[in-house]
From Swiss-Prot:
Keywords: Repeat, WD repeat. It comes from Drosophila ananassae (Fruit fly). Belongs to the WD repeat WDR55 family. WD repeats lie at residues 144-183, 188-227, 231-269, 272-311, 314-353, 398-437. InterPro entries: WD40/YVTN_repeat-like_dom_sf, WD40_repeat_CS, WD40_repeat_dom_sf, WD40_rpt, WDR55_POC1. This is WD repeat-containing protein 55 homolog.
């Protein structure tokens, strides 16, 4: 999960909401079903009279009158002619219906009527649905894999995303709004690949695994470039790229190592943590290396001095993720209790502020801008929050299951997430560039903000629906006057 500090200025192009493919198919199916129902209702209009049979009431009247004047010796001279006319009428009606239906039956009628509805629909709700269906995509479609996705990483220069899986493979996809294309599947590890990262120049792909190895793959040749076999004594959980040559790794036992791609062995090793290292992070100058861990410590290492810088006071919760904000002046850490701890840069012994965050555990954090972060966890929602002062901005996107990985591309416009459902979804977060700075004394509704759906969300807000209705009524009143 690689963080980026470069953000692109928003263009003037019209932004559109992403529409879930399943939602589109569902809407089309409902419209087709409605049209089919109307077509069936029209077919029901072929009654007994159209088929040549007399109406039921007339039959009763005729029977009643014939009973009164019944003559057993009389001859029914019209009976044969009546039956013949009835058979001819039935055959003519059946032929007419067959010609109307054609070889495909009612499906042809549904198709024709649906096309007409697209052009001539007067119902405002249906027109809105059709307009939404015709909108172009603002983000690539979902990627679905057979295996569990453990981590994802965007290429820094190309439209490529790497997906690490639990069986040790890495899938390289070329993504676009029109569709995604699998470039290649690289079999790199014998056990679960836990972290995947590109170097800053994008030439190399680094992976670490439960098999205790670190692999370096050349992106140009797509072949193995270097193997650090048994890089740790324990399973490696996380990896962080500092630049095109340096990277750091942390394992399940708390050991942190710094590596240089130009050497065969690690540069230095430090063991100051007693539990799993959950994330590694460094500042832009690469002078400090920070590590969060499951034992509730924030540990900072001095890279040039190759020694411990400071270790925080213990917390009664797991520290899972972190990010740097406000011009490298603030460090924010997410915890297993859904809290966010803020530290002044350099003062990592104890937090200066604590934000309530969300009620569910926070396991992932990605800086989108210098003041906006996206956090995710077990509840399956990706939420945006403003840092210093803290504000919930709303829901960026959703998954049906807990979210496992999160990353943002180099421009800061596209966010990708994967869940326990083996799916990877994309969210266009370009709109964050237009968010203004939040003031400390600004009034806000915390309850509403936490449930507010942002433009990239696949859900809509109830208030938006009623606002559109009110606007429509105002427009109608203006037209009437």
């Amino acid at each position: 999960m690689h963080t980026h500090n470069h953000f692109k200025t928003p263009s003037d192009a019209e932004e559109v909401d992403d529409l879930d493919d399943e939602m589109v198919m569902g809407v089309i199916a409902e419209i087709e079903q409605e049209v089919l129902f109307e077509s069936d209702s029209d077919d029901d209009g072929f009654g007994a009279e159209q088929l040549g049979a007399p109406p039921p009431d007339d039959d009763n009247d005729q029977i009643s009158s014939s009973d009164d004047s019944f003559d057993p010796n009389a001859e029914d001279s019209d009976s044969d002619d009546s039956m013949q006319h009835e058979e001819q009428a039935q055959a003519t009606s059946a032929k007419r219906r067959k010609d109307d239906d054609g070889p495909s039956g009612s499906n042809r009628d549904v198709e024709t009527n649906f096309d007409l509805d697209l052009e001539d629909e007067t119902d405002e709700t249906v027109r809105a649905i059709i307009a939404a269906i015709k909108k172009p995509r603002s983000a690539p479609p979902e990627i679905k894999l057979e295996d569990f996705v453990t981590d994802i990483s965007f290429h820094p220069e190309r439209n490529i995303i790497a997906l690490a899986t639990i069986i040790g493979d890495v899938h390289l996809y070329e993504y676009a709004n029109e569709g995604n294309k699998l470039i290649r599947t690289i079999e790199v590890h014998s056990k679960a690949c836990r972290d995947v990262e590109f170097t800053e120049d994008g030439r190399n792909l680094l992976t670490c695994s439960k098999d205790k190895c670190v692999m370096v793959t050349d992106m140009e040749t797509e072949k193995l470039k270097k193997l650090y076999e048994t890089a740790h004594d324990d399973a490696i959980n996380t990896l962080h790229v500092l630049n095109e040559n340096l990277f750091a790794t942390g394992d399940d036992a708390g050991t942190v190592k710094l590596w240089d791609l130009r050497t065969k062995q690690h540069v230095f090793e430090l063991k100051q943590i007693d539990d799993q290292v959950t994330q590694l992070l460094s500042n832009e100058q690469n002078t400090l290396l920070l590590a969060t861990s499951a034992d509730g410590y924030l540990t900072t290492f001095n890279i040039p001095g190759r020694k411990l810088y400071v270790q925080s006071e213990p917390y009664e919760e797991e520290l899972n993720c972190m990010g740097i904000y406000r011009g490298d002046s603030k460090l924010v850490v997410g915890t297993s209790k859904g809290k966010l701890y803020s530290y002044n840069w350099g003062s990592f012994g104890y937090h200066c502020d604590m934000y309530p965050g969300i009620k569910s555990p926070i396991s992932l954090m990605i800086p989108i801008t210098d003041r906006i972060a996206c956090v995710a966890g077990e509840d399956g929602n990706i939420r945006a929050c403003h840092i210093t002062p803290y504000r919930n901005l709303g829901v960026v996107g959703q998954h049906n299951m807990p979210i496992e990985a999160l990353d943002v591309n180099s421009t800061g416009e596209l966010l990708a997430s994967s869940s326990h459902n083996n799916d990877v979804r994309f969210w266009n977060v370009k709109y964050f560039e237009d968010f203004g700075d939040i003031k400390y004394n600004e009034k806000h509704n915390a309850y509403k903000e936490q449930r507010h759906n942002l433009p990239s969300s696949k859900c809509t807000n109830t208030g938006d629906f009623f606002a559109d209705l009110a606007k429509q009524e105002d427009d109608e009143d203006d037209d009437a006057t």
